[in-house]
A protein has these predicted regions:
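The beta1-alpha1 cofactor-binding region of Rossmann-like NAD(H)/NADP(H)-dependent oxidoreductases
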Residues: 22-33, 65, 178-179
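Substrate-binding pocket helix/loop in short-chain dehydrogenase/reductase
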Residues: 59-60, 67-72, 154, 165
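Active-site loop immediately N-terminal to the catalytic Tyr-X3-Lys motif
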Residues: 61, 108-114, 136-137, 172, ...
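Active-site helix of classical SDR
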Residues: 83, 119, 127
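Alpha-helical segment proximal to the catalytic Tyr-Lys
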Residues: 88, 132-136
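Residue(s) in the substrate-gating loop at a strand-loop-helix junction
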Residues: 103
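C-terminal helical subdomain
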Residues: 143, 166-189
């Protein structure tokens, strides 16, 4: 896409290589193919950041099974798929860092977001188990559970919802994407 081409162009330099890949993280075969391509292009994978996510908010009474399943498939199953696809590389290297994006909604819940809350709390439980399973092999698994972060996804919210959320934040403003990016850098190092 144009957006990914622009990002690749901005990040590429004489000293660094940046490449964009298109895949569907909710499909295990595509995850395995993606990992193979990255290994071919870069030789190794040191860090995995699982950040695929969607919302399809609705009250339970109005939520369709299809909307529930698609949020679980994209938000939670993708974490399993990419982690499983990278596991062999991390085990071979006896090192690796897995960073999974959850949400404060996965900890606290939120009315009208039962599917999203289930997916994000599932990420927390999955990550705890993977940390215990792979930690002895020097493979770390951490979760970031941000509160309200200003993104394209939150830009769709009404002013009243944004104001209500901001009033419950000590800084009285949403977090920025660079706040989360800096935390990823710390956890990956």
């Amino acid at each position: 896409s144009e957006a990914s081409d622009l990002i690749v162009s901005e990040l590429s330099s004489d000293k660094s290589l940046c490449k964009a890949y298109k895949s569907d993280a909710s499909k295990i075969e595509e995850c395995e193919n993606l990992v193979e391509k990255v290994i071919t292009d870069f030789g190794n994978i040191d860090v995995l950041i699982n950040n695929a996510g969607i919302t399809k908010d609705n009250l339970l009474m109005r939520m369709t099974e299809e909307d529930f399943d698609s949020v679980i498939r994209i938000n939670l199953n993708s974490v399993f798929n990419m982690t499983k696809a990278c596991q062999r590389i991390f085990l071979k290297n006896r090192a690796g860092s897995i960073i999974n994006m959850s949400s404060v909604v996965g900890v606290k819940g939120n009315a009208g977001q039962s599917n999203y809350a289930a997916s994000k709390s599932g990420i927390i439980g999955f990550s705890k188990s993977i940390a215990l399973e792979l930690g002895s092999r020097n493979i770390r698994c951490n979760v970031i559970a941000p509160g309200f972060i200003k993104t394209e996804m939150t830009d769709k919210l009404s002013e009243s919802v944004i104001e209500s959320w901001n009033n419950n934040i000590p800084l009285k403003r949403p977090g920025e994407t660079y706040d989360v990016a800096n935390l990823c850098l710390f956890l990956a190092s």
